[in-house]
Amino acid sequence: MEVRVSKAVRFSRYGGSEVLEVVEVDDRPPAQGEVRVRVVAAGINPGEIAIREGAMESVTPSRFSRGEGPEGEGSDFAGVIVEVGDRVDGVSVGDEVIGFSDWRSAQAESVTLPADHVIPKPHGVSWDVAGSLFVAGTTARACVDAVRIRRGDTVVVAGAAGGVGILATQLAVLGGAAVVATASKENHAFLESIGAIPVEYGKGLVDRIRRIVPDGVDAFIDTHGDGNVEAAVKLGVDRDRINTIIDWPARKKFGVRGEGMSTVAPRETLIELARLLANGELVLPIQATYPLDQVRAAYERQGKRHGLGKIVLEVTPAP
């Protein structure tokens, strides 16, 4: 039997973007209950930088640290099913899908995974948006759920111009909250367009928020770090309604929440998000796109933590 090969991102040691390589790997045929997908687009996420630099080894150890070979990269993708394993119902070769990989292997021309890790891609959702939806979307949903947003609440979303922040802001607005969104000035017009009240981050943030919402803040979502948890505490937010996805020292110091994507049902949440995007109730801007062989440049841009929306790898041609 002929073995097919395709390109994939791999790294064999911890470090900066220089450790990332695009290499040829054997395509694994789908086993029972699995599908193989040709990846069209794959998202880039900040947390992947922390994993690749070794900062998360105690939580998500790499394959190479266990002596199991190189590590893959990425969880988000969208593509076209090219093979279907035995005992798989509801999907067929040629179906356009949005998916998620449990094994950080999505940044590749081909990915094989359980069939329940893909959902239909709505026709109205672009490949770039579909390919960068899973991590940001499920994390945003988890953040909003963690702080128990109720209709009429005032909520601050810190770091609102990133993928998680943009989606958390919109989910909170859809839930009936008034959202104060922190971001640099160049992103304020966009945040206003999605229903938020923008405020510039940095020194004096607490005073600026108090002037905007003198009656106080009910909940606070931190997607950026850099003192936002302390700001939430100074604003008098109930610590059980403060959630950070990045500032673990502050989480421990102040006793706030630290809930992320692992706390929501992945497939069901992805279906909900795709429906909201297709209906026009959510938008997800794309900051930049790169071909697979420029993955290092893509992560270098991500590491600057500036810009509006998602960075995406365009892996193979769209149908």
Predicted regions, residues:
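Glycine-rich cofactor phosphate-binding loops and adjacent beta1-alpha1 units
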Residues: 180, 194-260
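A structural motif shared across PLP-dependent enzymes of the aminotransferase-like
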Residues: 101-115
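A glycine-/small-residue-rich N-terminal strand-loop-strand element
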Residues: 77-102
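C-terminal hydrophobic helical "lid"/dimerization subdomain
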Residues: 2-4, 270-319
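Mid-domain Rossmann-like dinucleotide-binding core that forms the NAD(H)/NADP(H) cofactor-binding site
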Residues: 131-202
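Short helix-loop-beta connector
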Residues: 92, 123-126, 148-154
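N-terminal glycine-rich beta->alpha transition that marks the start or flank
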Residues: 2-4, 16-19, 25-78
